[in-house]
Regions:
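Conserved active-site tyrosine of GNAT-family acetyltransferases
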Residues: 128-132, 286, 291
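Conserved hydrophobic beta-strand within the GNAT/NAT acetyltransferase core sheet
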Residues: 117-120, 237, 271-275
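Acyl-donor-binding surface of acyltransferase catalytic domains
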Residues: 78-163, 298-302
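Conserved donor-binding loop and adjoining core beta-sheet/short helix segment
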Residues: 6-15, 22-110, 224-234, 240-243
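Flexible, substrate/cofactor-facing loop regions flanked by secondary structure
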Residues: 152-235
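Conserved N-terminal entry element of GNAT/NAT acetyltransferase domains
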Residues: 1-28, 138-139, 150-173
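A structural microfeature
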Residues: 74, 141-143, 221-222, 295
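Conserved acetyl-CoA-binding loop-helix of GNAT-fold acetyltransferases
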Residues: 93-108, 242-244, 248-265, 270, ...
Length: 303
């Protein structure tokens, strides 16, 4: 098979990569480490940075591998300065070799020592992990835990809130301001409302699943965005957080229960979430709310 690689050309390449991720999921759900939701978020935020701030450097951090008919077979992406995602079909896993070569060459262009490049894998892709070992990479001790919850065959969950607290979706600029205040308090992430409007154009964005939980005084107490692919009947929570002063009151559990109930009404069969291995409270929350650990997403660097 004749295969060639090329750089990013236009916005349609992002749609094609998103389609590749979804196609591979239907073949082998756990082969690639990048979920459709996290890719949608990443791509829309980059388009937002481009439109709002004129930032285009991210375009040079994408490489695509295609057959002679320009069907996409694989892609390599620097998600940020040093974190790399590689996407392939299982039948085209051999492309991971030239992809890795490109990653290291691009890292040199970015003035990154090989030891600084961090490559993410799914532990359900042993070929990729063995390849990295053979090339002198070693696994970091920390990892993400990927969890899933089955939404079929069950009744709606109880949404238990303290008196006066309410859950709603973001429906106004005031709601969005409260949400962004929450993400800054929890994750130290000061979001931009103009970029967020572009983020909302993602194919997996559903307005009714962009949730905030408010105190009786109207303060942001907890929040959670859920991304839904109707064709896959799969959703993902990202992000989820509770403002420090409102923790230990069951608000995270209530918001997740409400989100799962809304997903059931949309016909969603499964929802996922990820948490860092050392995030004790987050892992307890997801375990308590019915998310079962499925796999680890590992990170590799050169020795």
């Amino acid at each position: 098979m004749e295969i060639q690689s090329r750089g990013y050309q236009d916005q349609s390449d992002l749609s094609t990569i998103g389609s590749l991720i979804r196609q591979v999921y239907q073949i082998d759900a756990y082969w690639n480490s990048w979920s459709f939701a996290l890719f949608d978020i990443w791509s829309q935020r980059n388009l937002g940075d481009q439109e709002v701030f004129g930032m285009t450097e991210w375009q040079h951090n994408i490489r695509l591998w295609e057959d002679r008919n320009r069907n996409l077979l694989g892609a390599a992406v620097f998600r940020d300065r040093d974190l790399v995602k590689l996407i392939t079909f299982p039948d085209h896993k051999y492309l991971l070799v030239p992809m890795l070569d490109w990653v290291e060459a691009r890292g040199h262009q970015k003035a990154l020592p090989n030891q600084k490049i961090k490559i993410e894998t799914s532990e359900h892709n042993p070929f990729f992990e063995k390849l990295l070992l053979s090339q002198g990479y070693e696994k970091d001790p920390g990892h993400y835990i990927y969890r899933e919850k089955d939404l079929t065959g069950g009744q709606n969950e109880l949404v238990i809130l303290p008196t006066g607290f309410t859950i709603q979706h973001i429906d106004s600029s005031d709601d969005l301001e409260k949400f962004h205040h929450g993400t800054k308090l929890v994750f130290n992430f000061p979001d931009n409302p103009d970029i967020y409007q572009i983020l909302r154009l993602a194919p997996s964005f559903v307005p009714e699943l962009d949730l905030i939980l408010l105190s009786p005084e109207g303060q942001i107490a907890s929040f959670g965005s859920i991304w839904f692919d109707q064709r896959l009947s799969l959703a993902e929570f990202e992000p989820v957080g509770t403002v420090p002063e409102f923790r230990k009151r069951g608000l995270g559990s209530a918001l997740i229960a409400e989100g799962c109930n809304r997903l059931r009404r949309l016909g969603c069969r499964k929802v996922s979430v990820m948490s860092w291995s050392e995030s004790v409270e987050a892992n307890r929350l997801y375990q308590r709310t019915g998310f079962l650990p499925i796999l680890k997403k590992n990170y590799w660097r050169r020795r």
